Design a protein with these regions (language model features):
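A mid-to-C-terminal "edge-of-domain" accessory segment
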Residues: 4-54, 305-478
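Hydrophobic faces of well-ordered beta-strands that scaffold small-molecule active sites
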Residues: 48-51, 86-90, 112-118, 136-138, ...
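Active-site beta-loop-alpha junctions enriched in small/polar residues
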Residues: 54, 91-95, 117-121, 141-143, ...
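Conserved, mostly hydrophobic/aromatic
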Residues: 56, 136, 178, 212, ...
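Alpha/beta enzyme core
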Residues: 65-83, 122-138, 142-151, 155-177, ...
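N-terminal active-site wall of soluble small-molecule enzyme domains
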Residues: 92-117, 121-127
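Glycine-enriched alpha-helix->loop->beta-strand junction motifs that scaffold or abut catalytic
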Residues: 107-111, 130-135, 208, 268-276
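Catalytic alpha/beta core domains of metabolic enzymes, predominantly
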Residues: 218-354
């Protein structure tokens, strides 16, 4: 690793360093390589923090107090005493915000711990003191884009402003969590390192933690080997521990998904010295969103080999809550929570699932997420797809499983084929298939009065099946 001369004084430049060779604005940003070899340094204990009520909520219609409390309860159930979901971050600006925080505090949960977020001014700080919250995030924009263009300050003025509010927090016994906004466009050794070193001095003087949150505001971070600053996630993390002596448990990464890199960047931050990853449920957030909390839970399990006693079935409850109560449409193919994330439509895959669902399912989604693997039926499904749908929908196992060679499966397939021959273009709905299958398979019918189809007749005479269908069902051709 190249050795840099680090001191506690900012490089107080007259003009903003906008890294135009990397961020030309009228072109796609560039990735520059300096081929520095950064050693992996994953902390023994890592965790996830939640900013659904702060950064996430900014992108949606405001949550009600009751909705915030319900989501907070779900976060607690999801964590299940493991401490993996360590903290949850809240706004304090409106009466509604403060009421929600008070109700969450009344729950008395150990996890997630409740923290706040404020701008770098003393008036905001009074809100934290009045709520008796032990830790608060403080906005500390660190790129020249923000310091010069947004705040209209010099680097020295910005540093003095940030140190003053951090010192105020420490003097009142509140842990400051310094949000270094836009760090992936910042002059790392000209501003970030001097600021963080000064913050560590304040920490030592007060004998209290001063936490550092690295905020990849525009999702510009990259995790490639040999990538250079300011975009290198590895070098940012390494610099905190190596040049600034920040303990890993005081470091947090907050990413955005503008370049589809939020999950690999967050995982890289863990691997190179960061203990905490900031996230939101379902990845909600500004523009392309934040790091999905559910993604980092699975990353945690893969890296650590265990999710302790977390209850991941709660993720399915959370997805239902967001869609039904909050009106948020989760993209169908979203991993772990989307309606189609473990749905198979290809006939050849359905045949594999029919033999053993492990062939085409990522893990036991039924056990872990309460989301059994599903086979959707369309014009390409074939006998295997229909048999697999029957087995998964009705939870049939072992000797109760329906074989694709069962003649009654052919009966159902004939009905499916008719739908598409008549111009249908959509997948057959579960409710439609359920009715057809119960009519065809007597042992699966919960209504013994239902007319059971003689599949031997139907196999040779489609019209017989159609008359039974018309008599017993109301099907839609969507």
């Amino acid at each position: 690793m190249h050795s840099y001369k680090c001191d506690n004084e900012v490089e107080n430049v007259a003009e903003a360093n906008l890294y135009r060779d990397i961020f030309p604005y009228t072109e796609i940003p560039k990735v520059v390589f300096d081929n520095k070899n950064i050693p992996m340094n994953m902390p023994k204990d890592v965790w996830i923090t939640d900013t659904t009520f702060r950064d996430g909520q900014q992108s949606m219609s405001p949550f009600t107090v009751e909705q915030i409390l319900t989501i907070f309860d779900y976060l607690h159930k999801l964590d299940n005493g493991s401490g993996i979901i360590r903290q949850s971050e809240f706004f304090l600006y409106t009466e509604k915000d403060r009421e929600a925080v008070e109700k969450c505090i009344e729950r008395g949960y150990e996890f997630p711990q409740i923290t706040a977020w404020i701008r770098a001014n003393k008036e905001d700080f009074k809100l934290v003191k009045n709520m008796n919250i032990k830790e608060t995030g403080i906005l500390m924009s660190c790129s020249d884009y923000h310091i010069f263009k947004k705040l209209n300050l010099t680097r020295q003025q910005a540093m003095e402003k940030y140190l003053e509010i951090a010192e105020e927090a420490l003097a009142n016994g509140i842990i400051p969590r310094c949000h270094l906004e836009d760090i992936t466009r910042a002059d790392y050794f000209g501003f970030v390192v001097p600021l963080v070193r000064r913050l560590m001095e304040l920490s030592a003087k007060a004998n209290m933690p001063v936490k550092i949150r690295a905020c990849d505001t525009l999702g510009l971070g990259v995790c490639h080997d040999g990538a250079a600053l300011p975009r290198s996630v590895k070098q940012i993390m390494h610099g905190f521990t190596h040049y600034c002596n920040v303990p890993s448990e005081w470091i947090e990464w907050h990413g955005h998904n503008d370049f589809y890199s939020v999950v690999p960047n967050s995982t890289t931050a863990w691997l190179y010295g960061c203990a905490g990853i900031s996230s939101t449920l379902l990845g909600i957030g500004e523009r392309t969103g934040n790091c999905p909390l559910e993604a980092m839970i699975v990353e945690y399990g893969q890296l650590k080999g265990s999710i302790k006693n977390m209850d991941l079935t709660v993720l399915t409850d959370i997805a239902t809550l967001f869609e039904k109560d909050l009106g948020y449409q989760i993209p169908h193919k979203t991993p772990f929570v989307g309606s189609d994330f473990n749905v198979t439509k290809a006939g050849i895959h359905a045949d594999g699932i029919l033999k053993d669902e492990e062939i085409y399912n990522i893990f036991d989604t039924g056990k872990i997420l309460n989301r059994p693997v599903v086979v959707a039926v369309n014009e390409y499904s074939g006998l295997a797809g229909i048999a697999a749908w029957i087995n998964t929908f009705f939870r049939l196992t072992d000797d109760k499983k329906i074989n694709k060679r069962d003649p009654r499966v052919i009966t159902v397939k004939e009905w499916v084929d008719e739908q598409y021959a008549d111009g249908r273009t959509s997948v057959i709905g579960n409710d439609e298939l359920e009715k057809i299958v119960k009519l065809t398979f007597e042992e699966l019918s919960d209504d013994k009065k239902v007319e059971v189809i003689d599949y031997k007749v139907c196999k040779s005479k489609r019209g017989t099946f159609r008359s039974v269908q018309d008599k017993n069902l109301e099907t839609s051709k969507r």
